[in-house]
Amino acid sequence: MNPEQSPLGKATVYAAQYDASLLFPIPRAGAREQLGITSALPFFGTDIWNAYELSWLNARGKPQVAIATFYVPAESPNIVESKSFKLYLGSFAQSKFDSVDAVRDVLKRDVSAACGASVSVQLVSAHDFRKLEMDELDGLSLDRLDLDADVYEPDPSLLSAADGEDEAPVEETLVSDLLRSNCPVTGQPDWGSVQIHYVGPQIDHAGLLRYIISFRNHTGFHEQCVERIFLDIMRACKPVKLAVYARYTRRGGLDINPFRTNYNQPMPDNARTARQ
């Protein structure tokens, strides 16, 4: 299936009852081939989806609400198109389930089937909402730099790193809130924050910020943009270790937060940023 066949940008009919067939998978392979990935993945990681508009009926017909988090492995063959995900979650609203566990089991089964890999699902019920945290991405802000920018399509030539053999490798965590890309189907802007942690030659901060800004007119799904950022930094700056984590603002009750790395480390924190 390709994005043009998805529900994006089309008139919407909301399902009256639970319907797993609403999920619309999109293969990752096409976008990855455009990035030069044709065999083994040069990274691993997770796409963290948070769903804020999930509701269903209990066995007695009383509405229940929860926030759902889905952990989709980067090696899954498919992603789920976001509007189809919204419509699928909306189909729970007038359907009865015996328990929260029953809802979680159905979500895990259906989304795993659509993605082609095992997806972890967590549900936070209303009485636990106050436990949810909000925080900003840790790291040195690139946005502090006062600079000119005039490139608004991804340009890896903006990236550079120290090349002296005598230069000791550095370890840095850098962040920016200036990431913007655009939906490849509707053209709607997607706003995000990005965190880049690396070990290796010192990356030029001004060039990295200009590179992040260069996504401003780019069309691509969230996951594809993060993978492109990861690969461009690896190729241009040659770090020994690299991790890229983006948190995008929500649309349609969903936010998507892709994480890619080439070394083992804990799962990134799923705390919402202020803009989410």
Curated annotation (Swiss-Prot):
One of its GO terms (molecular function) is preQ1 synthase activity. It catalyses: 7-aminomethyl-7-carbaguanine + 2 NADP(+) = 7-cyano-7-deazaguanine + 2 NADPH + 3 H(+). Its EC number is 1.7.1.13. Pathway: tRNA modification; tRNA-queuosine biosynthesis. PANTHER family: NADPH-DEPENDENT 7-CYANO-7-DEAZAGUANINE REDUCTASE (PTHR34354:SF1). NADPH binds at residues 82-83, 251-252. One of its GO terms (cellular component) is cytoplasm. Substrate binds at residues 80-82, 222-223. InterPro entries: GTP-CH-I_C/QueF, NADPH_dep_7-cyano-7-deazaG_red, QueF, QueF_N, QueF_type2. One of its GO terms (biological process) is tRNA modification. The lineage of its organism: Bacteria, Pseudomonadati, Pseudomonadota, Betaproteobacteria, Burkholderiales. This is NADPH-dependent 7-cyano-7-deazaguanine reductase. The keyword Cytoplasm applies.
